[in-house]
Amino acid sequence: YKPLIGKFCEIPVGPKQYRRLIPIITDEYPDPNFGSGAVKITGAHDFNDYQVAKRSNIPMYSLMDKKGVMRVDGLPYKDEVAKAQAILNEEINWDEDLIASMNLVPDEYRGLDRFEARKKVVTEITAEGLAVMVDATDNEGNLSTKAFVESKPIMQPFGDRSKVVIEPMLTDQWFVETSKIVKPALDAVKNGEIKIIPESGEKTYYHWLNNIEPWCISRQLWWGHQVPVWFDKDGNQYC
């Protein structure tokens, strides 16, 4: 892939005349022995892609809302693409607020459930001849072609209760910069003030604290049970 680094490729969805170009970059994250060795990056909706996007300073465009529906806000797709192209060409400066306000979901996909949108993308890519096709035989023995789909294991989070696929997304949260407060904990073990038993646990301890991530301290879950309380127009409480 070396000759392709620094070039651009087209995202094959949406009206042909408005399709967006994205850069082809290199990173140590992809496994060259897994699949093609090349991956797409969706920084706003994948933990690993987020880190890759940060390292390469790639804008992270959110495509879904909190209900798993493709976004419907923002300008028409052609206008958002023009703005994204200007950002790519370094014609305009950008920050997180600008990127968060932009909706790069093609107009025909807006408002669709995420799974509906996926099926529509596959159908349209296949119809346009952009999918890899393989020979297939139907139940009656007739030979045809179909889009090639590889079955590969991936790490996919599901909700414990809903059993529904969890989609990572960018939200505003409060974090503690833990890298600034771990030094005393590291020094306490290094100088012998704290002894880890068995001693082999020290390696795990050092690896954890030396690679610690910021700690998210804000929550969207309920703390405890909700108590049903009502107030009438006179201020009386009913529980």
Question: What annotation goes with each model-predicted range?
Answer:
Residues 1-2:
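Conserved, ordered domain cores of eukaryotic regulatory proteins
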Residues 6-15:
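Short conserved beta-strand and strand-loop elements enriched in small hydrophobics
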Residues 6, 33-238:
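Residue patterns forming the tRNA-binding/recognition surfaces of aminoacyl-tRNA synthetases
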Residues 16-20:
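Short coil-to-beta-strand transition motifs
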Residues 21-27:
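Short beta-strand-centered aromatic/proline hotspots
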Residues 13, 28, 64-67:
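Residues at the C-termini of beta-strands that transition into short coil/loop
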